[in-house]
């Protein structure tokens, strides 16, 4: 299993880091089989798995439950788990309780937190206690209400400078990596060159140290629309619907199950059961 030390070496050597979300045993198992470097158990599970309109309703218990399943499916892959909405915007003591629960109960190797400001002290607090933390800047889904929706961040010089400073502060606070979401590629490249820790982009262009996508977006599974920055590599949703539709048709028309899908009794046992009469 790769560790944070390996990810630092990958950045130094210019080897791109691959990260993918996973939310359950089968998706994690497939991600590991495909040799993904890092798995993110994102609170995006609230939208793509649980059917919420945002990530806000996701709880610590949800993250623990899903991370445990991912851990069972990907025992040899570095796993990062999101701290959900308001689980770290509380007192330092309560933040530590939530962080400890996720790490101890789920088996996550690192936690991810969104934003800067007061979150910088949270990063320092958690890393000082020995909990690896991945920072997340740019578009931060837990704060879309404040940001005015799902919009590109850092498009003007003033906001770009703030993101640069926030990124540096995240590294200084002890973050082991930084996710940059929906920021101009020029800004993402500049930030990546300023930091010694790896940057993982999602909608941040090519010049970052790695990429992350949502599992369901990448394979077109249960999604109707995807963001501009997503490339869909396969379309399993179409195959799944086709297969289920065929099943429904065959049951309705009596084509399924066939004899080969059924079990039988010996003739003498049938006679003993109902005398050969039905």
UniProtKB/Swiss-Prot annotation:
Catalyzes the reversible reaction in which hydroxymethyl group from 5,10-methylenetetrahydrofolate is transferred onto alpha-ketoisovalerate to form ketopantoate. GO terms for cellular component: cytoplasm. NCBIfam families: panB (TIGR00222), PRK00311.1 (NF001452). Keywords: Cytoplasm, Magnesium, Metal-binding, Pantothenate biosynthesis, Transferase. 3-methyl-2-oxobutanoate binds at residues 43-44, 82, 112. Its cofactor is Mg(2+). It catalyses: 3-methyl-2-oxobutanoate + (6R)-5,10-methylene-5,6,7,8-tetrahydrofolate + H2O = 2-dehydropantoate + (6S)-5,6,7,8-tetrahydrofolate. GO terms for biological process: pantothenate biosynthetic process. It is found in: Cytoplasm. The gene is panB. Gene3D superfamilies: Phosphoenolpyruvate-binding domains. Homodecamer; pentamer of dimers. The keyword Cytoplasm applies. This is 3-methyl-2-oxobutanoate hydroxymethyltransferase. Binds 1 Mg(2+) ion per subunit. The active site is at residue 181. GO terms for molecular function: 3-methyl-2-oxobutanoate hydroxymethyltransferase activity; magnesium ion binding. InterPro entries: Pantoate_hydroxy_MeTrfase, Pyrv/PenolPyrv_kinase-like_dom, Pyrv_kinase-like_dom_sf. The keyword Amino-acid biosynthesis does not apply. Its EC number is 2.1.2.11.
């Amino acid at each position: 299993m790769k560790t944070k030390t390996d990810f630092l070496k990958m950045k130094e050597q210019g080897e791109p880091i691959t990260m993918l979300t996973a939310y359950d045993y089968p998706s994690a198992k497939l991600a590991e089989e495909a040799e993904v470097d890092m798995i993110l158990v994102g609170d995006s599970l609230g939208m793509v798995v649980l059917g919420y309109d945002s990530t806000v309703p996701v709880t610590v218990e949800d993250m623990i439950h899903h991370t445990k399943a991912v851990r069972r499916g990907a025992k040899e892959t570095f796993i990062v788990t999101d701290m959900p909405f308001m689980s770290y915007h509380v007192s330092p003591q309560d933040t530590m309780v939530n962080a400890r629960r996720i790490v101890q109960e789920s088996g996550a190797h690192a936690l991810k937190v969104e934003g800067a400001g007061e979150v910088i002290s949270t990063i320092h607090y958690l890393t000082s206690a020995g909990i690896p933390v991945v920072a997340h800047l740019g578009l931060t889904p837990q704060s879309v209400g404040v940001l005015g929706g799902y919009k590109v961040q850092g498009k003007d010089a003033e906001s770009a400078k703030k993101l640069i400073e926030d990124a540096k502060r995240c590294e200084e606070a002890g973050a082991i990596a930084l996710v940059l979401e929906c920021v101009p590629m020029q800004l993402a490249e500049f930030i990546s060159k300023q930091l010694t820790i790896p940057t993982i982009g999602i909608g941040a262009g090519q010049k970052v140290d790695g990429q992350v996508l949502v599992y369901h977006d990448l394979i077109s599974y249960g999604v109707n629309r995807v963001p501009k920055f997503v490339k869909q590599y396969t379309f399993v949703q179409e195959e799944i619907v086709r297969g289920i539709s065929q099943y429904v048709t065959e049951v309705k028309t009596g084509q399924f199950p066939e004899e080969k899908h059924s079990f039988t009794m010996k003739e003498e046992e049938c006679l003993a059961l109902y005398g050969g009469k039905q």
